[in-house]
Regions:
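Internal active-site segments that recognize and position negatively charged phosphoryl groups
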Residues: 186
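Conserved "HGTGT" condensation-loop signature of ketosynthase/thiolase-family condensing enzymes
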Residues: 1-169, 174, 181, 189-196, ...
Length: 237
């Protein structure tokens, strides 16, 4: 709407031009609650000096460490990495995510990874339920923003980045039971292409009583209350 009168010095839309080279494309995505993203795709020349180059293959990738958490009893160790006051404000999935990730980094001898790639099938179910319950009980006028901010799938990966001061590549894959597979595949791509030397890969999920009842209706039983896997992958020296 209104594209016939573009903003001065702004981007002028077009209905399509022929015989015009396209080297850069800006893609925008706008979601509920300000969960927006922008992706800039650019075509580089083959002689680009700044483009990363490497001769690595998948055989050169090493797993420096692996940590797996499968029960809430395993979370007691989190006080070694995070202050008790902060821990009390975290849900069980966030605790599991932070503990497995920080412990894996410690075992690998890495303070700040070059990239963080996270997989999750269901995201932060506990906080999502609390948000929906609050909407049902209190309407949409005076909702607490905390439940929403801590219910999105990419909350986990973002919090790891904040804790480790990682400003590199950060993405979340939500591909059901294949989420970890997709996260590892992306990590291998970064390592083989020489973009990163170390990548923290994780897959984190939780279940709630309500969720377990719903899943039992479709024949899925014995879901773990929490389940986290964290890996540190590396390539090169």
């Amino acid at each position: 709407m209104g594209w016939e009168k573009p903003i001065i010095d702004g981007i002028v839309p077009t209905l399509g031009e022929k015989n015009y080279p396209i080297n850069t494309i800006l893609c925008n995505s706008f979601g509920f609650g300000g969960n927006d993203s922008a992706l800039l795709i650019s075509l580089h020349s083959s002689d680009c000096d700044d483009c990363p180059h490497s001769n690595y293959t998948e055989k050169d990738i090493r797993v420096l460490s692996k940590v797996e958490i499968q029960s809430e009893d395993d979370l007691l160790e989190i006080s070694k990495y995070i202050k008790p006051l902060e821990v009390r404000r975290m849900g069980k999935l966030m605790k599991s995510t932070m503990l497995s990730s920080l412990k894996a980094l410690e075992m690998a001898g890495i303070d700040v990874p070059d990239a963080i790639i996270t997989g999750t099938a269901w995201g932060c179910l506990e906080n999502s339920e609390k948000l929906l319950e609050q909407i049902c009980n209190e309407g949409e006028c005076m909702l607490k923003p905390t439940y929403f901010m801590q219910s999105t799938h990419n909350t986990l990966s973002s919090c790891i980045a904040i804790r480790t001061h990682c400003h590199g590549y950060n993405i979340t894959y939500s591909q059901g039971s294949n989420s970890l597979e997709w996260a590892i595949r992306d990590a291998k791509r970064l390592l083989i292409n020489g973009v990163c030397k170390s990548v923290l890969v994780g897959c984190h999920d939780e279940s709630t009583p309500t969720f377990r009842k719903l899943m039992e209706r479709v024949g899925v039983y014995n879901l773990n209350s929490i389940h986290s896997i964290a890996l540190v992958l590396s390539c090169g020296k």
